[in-house]
Amino acid sequence: MARYIGPKCKLSRREGTDLFLKSGVRALESKCNIEAAPGIHGQRRGRQSDYGTQLREKQKVRRIYGVLERQFSGYYKQAASQKGATGENLLQLLECRLDNVVYRMGFGATRAESRQLVSHKAISVNGQTVNVPSYQVKAGDVVAVREKSKNQLRIAQALELCAQRGRVEWVEVDAEKKSGVFKNVPARGDLSADINESLIVELYSK
């Protein structure tokens, strides 16, 4: 499945919530009516079946983190094989992706931009260049912008945006040095309450 490159507002309207796919403190323009489905006339949503609700939740989380279908399925299998709650394990695996950590630290304005920074070899982990967005960051790892990329305007702008919206507690960042530490894997209570991972578990359990 190819990666979606169309309008970001359309995806948020499809899921009925702001997925924060666009840069800025408020990701969507006021004209983007997330209460209505995509399309010129934006039909109101009818009642969904249990399966439809579960599928929409999976698609929402997949789109938030910018993960393709096959990758997401792989993460679920890995989460199910680990000890603990499968849903929480799944969210933690997604949070530990390098592109997501780069976004959480504020080096990229969006996860898509952060993924591009990683792919273009602008990011290092513990002093070593890593260009794999799905690389799993571990507690204590130092994630930094490489010297050759530190003067990029978009990184400075992303750090400003992050300062406005607030940084998560499980990363510690030196904005001047453009370097940060992934202090710990976030607990479920630290993550968005707008995600109902139990619906995803129900979907894959069928």
UniProtKB/Swiss-Prot annotation:
Cellular component GO terms held in the UniProt record: small ribosomal subunit
Parts forming coiled coils: none
Keywords: Ribonucleoprotein, Ribosomal protein, RNA-binding, rRNA-binding
One Pfam family in the UniProt entry: S4
Residue ranges constituting the S4 RNA-binding domain according to the UniProt record: 96-156
Gene Ontology molecular function, alphabetical: rRNA binding; structural constituent of ribosome
Keyword Methyltransferase among record annotations: no
Entry keyword Ribosomal protein: yes
SUPFAM superfamilies: Alpha-L RNA-binding motif
Subunit note: Part of the 30S ribosomal subunit. Contacts protein S5. The interaction surface between S4 and S5 is involved in control of translational fidelity.
Function: One of the primary rRNA binding proteins, it binds directly to 16S rRNA where it nucleates assembly of the body of the 30S subunit.
Family: Belongs to the universal ribosomal protein uS4 family.
PANTHER family reported in the protein's UniProt record: 30S 40S RIBOSOMAL PROTEIN, SMALL RIBOSOMAL SUBUNIT PROTEIN US4M
Annotated protein name in UniProt: Small ribosomal subunit protein uS4
